[in-house]
Amino acid sequence: DKQLDADVSPKPTIFLPSIAETKLQKAGTYLCLLEKFFPDIIKIHWQEKKSNTILGSQEGNTMKTNDTYMKFSWLTVPEESLDKEHRCIVRHENNKNGIDQEIIFPPIKTDVTTVDPKYNYSKDANDVITMDPKDNWSKDANDTLLLQLTNTSAYYTYLLLLLKSVVYFAIITCCLLRRTAFCCNGEKS
């Protein structure tokens, strides 16, 4: 049983949409993980920052962890809404001062400007070069795919060499056992 003086209000951890998700899916998923609360009765809903309209979201099951509980909720928004602030509103009996907890999710910039120093041929240190984020993201995705392909190739090469060594070991062992068996039948080598 929990002591009454222990803080058993929900402790939030937030996860923001990834760049890959926003580029590929044209949407973003905000995830709110609520942990270490007691009792297990909790209400969660989502709203845009300056709106009272409740947005459609999903929730996982409430799970028991040691003496407390945890639950997660997520909101998927279209690309047009990524530049707006969103709120995850949590109602729980042990919230501080009995007030609903409001967890703010910051807006996501969809047009990120990056500067790649190896392509910066400017002589003036104050010049800023902007690159198309789609090109930069594609380069990162290609690098990731190349790394994955290299690792997979190395794995299968290692596996093939290991298999070859096992077969070689089996053949040599058979040859040595036959030679030993032949030598032990009364003939000397």
Swiss-Prot record:
<feature type="glycosylation site" description="N-linked (GlcNAc...) asparagine">
    <location>
        <position position="136"/>
    </location>
</feature>
<comment type="subunit">
    <text>Gamma-delta TR is a heterodimer composed of a gamma and delta chain; disulfide-linked. The gamma-delta TR is associated with the transmembrane signaling CD3 coreceptor proteins following the stoichiometry: a single gamma-delta TR heterodimer associates with one CD3D-CD3E heterodimer, one CD3G-CD3E heterodimer and one CD247 homodimer forming a stable octameric structure. Upon activation, gamma-delta TR complex associates with FCER1G to initiate intracellular signaling.</text>
</comment>
<feature type="domain" description="Ig-like">
    <location>
        <begin position="10"/>
        <end position="104"/>
    </location>
</feature>
<feature type="glycosylation site" description="N-linked (GlcNAc...) asparagine">
    <location>
        <position position="120"/>
    </location>
</feature>
<dbReference type="InterPro" id="IPR007110">
    <property type="entry name" value="Ig-like_dom"/>
</dbReference>
<feature type="glycosylation site" description="N-linked (GlcNAc...) asparagine">
    <location>
        <position position="142"/>
    </location>
</feature>
<dbReference type="InterPro" id="IPR013783">
    <property type="entry name" value="Ig-like_fold"/>
</dbReference>
<keyword id="KW-0472">Membrane</keyword>
<dbReference type="GO" id="GO:0050852">
    <property type="term" value="P:T cell receptor signaling pathway"/>
</dbReference>
<protein>
    <recommendedName>
        <fullName>T cell receptor gamma constant 2</fullName>
    </recommendedName>
</protein>
<feature type="glycosylation site" description="N-linked (GlcNAc...) asparagine">
    <location>
        <position position="151"/>
    </location>
</feature>
<feature type="disulfide bond">
    <location>
        <begin position="32"/>
        <end position="88"/>
    </location>
</feature>
<dbReference type="GO" id="GO:0005886">
    <property type="term" value="C:plasma membrane"/>
</dbReference>
<keyword id="KW-1015">Disulfide bond</keyword>
<feature type="glycosylation site" description="N-linked (GlcNAc...) asparagine">
    <location>
        <position position="66"/>
    </location>
</feature>
<keyword id="KW-0393">Immunoglobulin domain</keyword>
<dbReference type="InterPro" id="IPR003597">
    <property type="entry name" value="Ig_C1-set"/>
</dbReference>
<feature type="transmembrane region" description="Helical">
    <location>
        <begin position="155"/>
        <end position="177"/>
    </location>
</feature>
<dbReference type="InterPro" id="IPR051117">
    <property type="entry name" value="TRG_var/const_region"/>
</dbReference>
<keyword id="KW-0812">Transmembrane</keyword>
<keyword id="KW-0391">Immunity</keyword>
<keyword id="KW-0675">Receptor</keyword>
<keyword id="KW-1279">T cell receptor</keyword>
<dbReference type="GO" id="GO:0006955">
    <property type="term" value="P:immune response"/>
</dbReference>
<dbReference type="GO" id="GO:0042106">
    <property type="term" value="C:gamma-delta T cell receptor complex"/>
</dbReference>
<dbReference type="GO" id="GO:0009897">
    <property type="term" value="C:external side of plasma membrane"/>
</dbReference>
<keyword id="KW-0325">Glycoprotein</keyword>
<dbReference type="GO" id="GO:0004888">
    <property type="term" value="F:transmembrane signaling receptor activity"/>
</dbReference>
<keyword id="KW-1133">Transmembrane helix</keyword>
<keyword id="KW-1003">Cell membrane</keyword>
<dbReference type="GO" id="GO:0002250">
    <property type="term" value="P:adaptive immune response"/>
</dbReference>
<dbReference type="Pfam" id="PF07654">
    <property type="entry name" value="C1-set"/>
</dbReference>
<keyword id="KW-1064">Adaptive immunity</keyword>
<comment type="function">
    <text>Constant region of T cell receptor (TR) gamma chain that participates in the antigen recognition. Gamma-delta TRs recognize a variety of self and foreign non-peptide antigens frequently expressed at the epithelial boundaries between the host and external environment, including endogenous lipids presented by MH-like protein CD1D and phosphoantigens presented by butyrophilin-like molecule BTN3A1. Upon antigen recognition induces rapid, innate-like immune responses involved in pathogen clearance and tissue repair.</text>
</comment>
<dbReference type="InterPro" id="IPR036179">
    <property type="entry name" value="Ig-like_dom_sf"/>
</dbReference>
